[in-house]
């Protein structure tokens, strides 16, 4: 009976240790986010609100990760006149000027045709796991599924292009 109790205690301790240990996915995400921080990203978990999609009564909210790059200093006049925008990957009626499969959350009909063409070129070049793109006077953001490091570098290039082009 004593051996049974000792075996039960040992098995329960091993089970508790295994339960607390991070999974392969957790280790991958920790390494990816450390690399993102090294590259200058701010990584934030937040709820992304989608526009109301075609055939759906209510807009959905998704918990996702935003990878952000700060714009740096821009002058006050440019900051005050900035046209913030956010697009998401979904089928919606608010899609004027965007590629198929993308819709506006903020900024529809506010940007020039030239800026829309630049945005569409960026959207076409993004990895499939990116579900949204955002631009404010403070930062540019990509919301994505954290698939692999190569995609993160591709996203960084796209966000740097957005900063350079003042999108």
Where does each model-flagged region fall?
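Short alpha-helix boundary/capping motifs
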Residues: 3, 7, 53, 60, ...
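Intrinsically disordered, low-complexity boundary segments flanking structured domains
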Residues: 27-32, 52-55, 120-121, 127-130
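Structured extramembrane domains adjacent to transmembrane segments
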Residues: 59-158
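Short extracytoplasmic
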Residues: 41-60
């Amino acid at each position: 009976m004593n051996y049974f109790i000792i075996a039960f205690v040992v098995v329960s301790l091993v089970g508790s240790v295994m339960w607390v240990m991070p999974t392969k996915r957790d280790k991958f995400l920790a390494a990816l986010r450390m690399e993102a921080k090294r590259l200058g990203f701010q990584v934030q978990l937040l709820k992304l609100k989608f526009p109301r999609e075609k055939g759906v009564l209510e807009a959905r909210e998704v918990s996702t990760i935003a990878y952000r790059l700060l714009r740096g200093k821009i002058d006050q006049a440019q900051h005050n006149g900035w046209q913030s925008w956010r697009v998401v990957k979904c089928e919606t009626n608010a899609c004027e000027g965007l590629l198929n499969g993308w819709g506006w959350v903020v900024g529809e009909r506010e940007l020039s045709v030239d800026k829309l063409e630049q945005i569409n070129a960026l959207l076409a070049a993004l990895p499939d796991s990116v579900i949204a793109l955002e631009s404010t006077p403070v930062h540019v953001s990509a919301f994505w599924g954290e698939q692999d490091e190569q995609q993160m570098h591709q996203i960084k290039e796209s966000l740097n292009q957005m900063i350079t082009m003042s999108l």
